[in-house]
Regions:
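Sec/Tat signal peptide C-region and signal peptidase I cleavage site
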Residues: 21-27
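Bacterial N-terminal signal peptides that target proteins for export
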Residues: 2-13
Length: 171
């Protein structure tokens, strides 16, 4: 009789503990994250070989829908590298924050969007999601932004692809 009573207590407790442990794992399911963006660069302070570049623009992406973004980037013009951060804001105000490292240089590829002119750069940014708000609170993931940017017209455009934890899963 005592064994039956113990199993009546231990089995539900074990199920409860397993369910609690499964919730954080479910919140970490990665889903595809991709889209397109366009914007305008604005050169800031230049302390050779580093130039500060601020970018603002818009785009459309999975889980974000239509969004706007602001980017701050410190570019080493000699090495063709950079580091920075982006604040991505969905139409409803939910947001994602990322940090990135970048590399880039001249390219012979055709322009990816109008307004780049004849001379532009190829830029690859590797992003890590560092936080978010709303349905992106607690978000994690990483993705790559591949874009082109004109040092003459200051236009930029490109695409991104990678993964993000399932939006809203942490709630």
């Amino acid at each position: 009789m005592k064994t039956i009573t113990n199993s009546r207590i231990y089995l539900p407790m074990a199920a409860l503990i397993l369910a609690a442990l499964a919730l954080p794992a479910a919140a970490q399911n990665l889903v595809p994250f991709k889209g397109a963006l366009q914007g305008n660069d604005k050169d800031g302070a230049f302390n050779p070989p580093i130039i500060q570049v601020a970018t603002s623009g818009t785009g459309t992406g999975t889980h974000l829908g239509e969004f706007s973004y602001t980017e701050v980037n410190a570019v080493n013009v000699v090495a063709g590298t950079g580091t920075g951060s982006i604040h991505w804001i969905a139409a409803n105000g939910d947001s994602i924050d990322t940090t990135f490292t970048a590399s880039g240089g001249p390219t012979d590829a055709p322009p990816a969007c109008p307004g780049l002119g004849e001379s532009f750069l190829r830029i690859t940014e590797i992003h890590t999601i560092t936080g978010g708000t709303g349905r992106f609170a607690g978000a994690q993931g990483s993705f790559i932004v591949e874009r082109q940017a004109s040092p003459v017209t200051f236009k930029t455009c490109g695409s991104f692809h990678g993964t993000i934890t399932s939006p809203g899963a942490a709630h």
